[in-house]
Amino acid sequence: MEIRLPDLALKRIFSFLDLFGLLQVSQVNKHWNRIADSDYLWRSLSLQRWDCSNFTNQHLGTHTWKQFFLHQRRKELRLALAQPHNFIYKVTKNIAFETELAYLSGNRLTVDEQEKSIICSVSPKQELCAWDVQEGTMIWSSPVQEFHFSNLVTLPQMHLAITMDRKKTIKVWNCQDRDALAVLPMPQPCYCMEAYLTKDGPFLMVGDAAGDIYTFTLPGLRDVSKVTAFQYGIVLLHCSPDKKWVFACGTYSRTLPQVFLTESLLRPSEGSVPLSTFLPHKLCASACWTPKVKNRITLMSQSSTGKKTEFITFDLTTKKTGGQTVIQAYEIASFQVAAHLKCPIWMGASDGYMIVFTSGPYLLLFSITGFLLQRFEDHQAAINNFWVDPCYVLTTSENSVHVYMWEEGGRHPYLRSCCHLENTWHDHTTDSCISSVMCDNASIVLRVRKVSDSSILVMYSLNT
């Protein structure tokens, strides 16, 4: 006699499965297929993999969450499986300036097959520019600015770009209208900005040279809160993937970094101090949140001589004590990088149990406890640029780019070597190097700095 579990119990069991598990159980019988195809399970899978908490049924249209998930995965795999001949590339003239690049398009989270990749850059004339990556054309530019841009971030979900200039002025642009949507002068230079979207709306967080963290609404730049975090400037400011936590680190290396509860910054109470805790490790050089374990953060700590590097991983929780909420940070793992390895500059994380970083020409993947999982030798010379997100890892060396992809569900091989793009665009008559690299599901963008101090953009897109 066949035992039929209630729908709720079966849905609970299926919630522990990954993509491949759900697809397998859906083939057992009609009952299991109906449960395995439910929007609840596929939305849960989507939330685990992407920042789509604000993606609604209205965005889906007539599509289901299963169709949405499989569509996104196909796009990810399409880039990962591409070979050099599958790309076309466009090269700009000497019109790029050495400041940040940022995607304005939300290419990753759509069900539109005709989506475009749009990148923001700054020109030598101090214009903010938006580029159609597939066409290689500039589609918008701001008026020439009086002062140089010092910082650029975007909020793709809102199609907004936010700039800071050397006059300490923040401006918000929609990259369609001529003028900025909002302008706000700041009392101090700002070293870092973070734009993010929550269930309460879009916000901008800014860390300044005085050690203060400001929170503003977007696009209007209305003041929400100001918190003094350090007595020195803030150089690192990172929101956790679920936007629940904010990591902040000051310029003074012996100051302990802090983690704030985002809600206490967005809803400040008069006379009360925002909830925060110190992470008990000094000399923090970099930090990254884990996309899959959203309350987990890994710090990279380096000695002043640069000869000793340590990775420390913490889990953050809140706890009620005596009627008050407190933040607790638990160190769950740490390890020191072997002395014979070149001191890493960049780092990234994926599933909560692995750390990826560069060392000379090598890309290394370690467990958070210090066990070497993979070593990649896809470059002959030292890696001079590195970029990581929940799907891809990019490395550059001299004038080539290598693409890696994280395996689904932390399966072996944990990080897959995919595609190597050589310098087909390179002008061999001049010296140059790649100074920035990033990608979305349909494109790879490089900024290449020439010896003359001018820069160009090289925009790869998949040939459809």
Curated annotation (Swiss-Prot):
Which named protein is this? Answer: F-box/WD repeat-containing protein 12
Q: Which CDD domains match?
A: F-box_FBXW12 (cd22137)
Q: Outline the extent of the F-box domain.
A: 1-45
Record InterPro entries: F-box-like_dom_sf (IPR036047), F-box_dom (IPR001810), F-box_SCF_Substrate_Recog (IPR052121), Quino_amine_DH_bsu (IPR011044), WD40/YVTN_repeat-like_dom_sf (IPR015943)
Q: Which Pfam families match?
A: F-box-like
- Give each disulfide bond as a residue pair: none
Q: Keywords in UniProt for this one?
A: Repeat, Ubl conjugation pathway, WD repeat
Quaternary structure (record) = Interacts with SKP1. Interacts with CUL1. Interacts with IL22RA1.
Q: Which PROSITE patterns match?
A: FBOX (PS50181)
> Which pathway is recorded for this entry?
Protein modification; protein ubiquitination
* Tissue distribution of the protein: Ubiquitously expressed.
- Ribonucleoprotein is among the record's keywords: no
Its domain of life reads Eukaryota
**Keyword Heme (UniProt):** no
WD repeat positions in this chain?
89-132, 136-174, 178-217, 222-263, 270-315, 320-367, 370-407, 416-461
Q: Which GO terms describe its biological process?
A: protein ubiquitination
- What is the annotated role of this protein in its UniProt record? Substrate-recognition component of the SCF (SKP1-CUL1-F-box protein)-type E3 ubiquitin ligase complex. Promotes degradation of interleukin-22 receptor subunit IL22RA1 in resting and IL22-stimulated conditions by facilitating its ubiquitination. Functions as a cell growth suppressor.
| GO CC terms in record | cytosol
SMART domains found in the cross-reference section:
FBOX
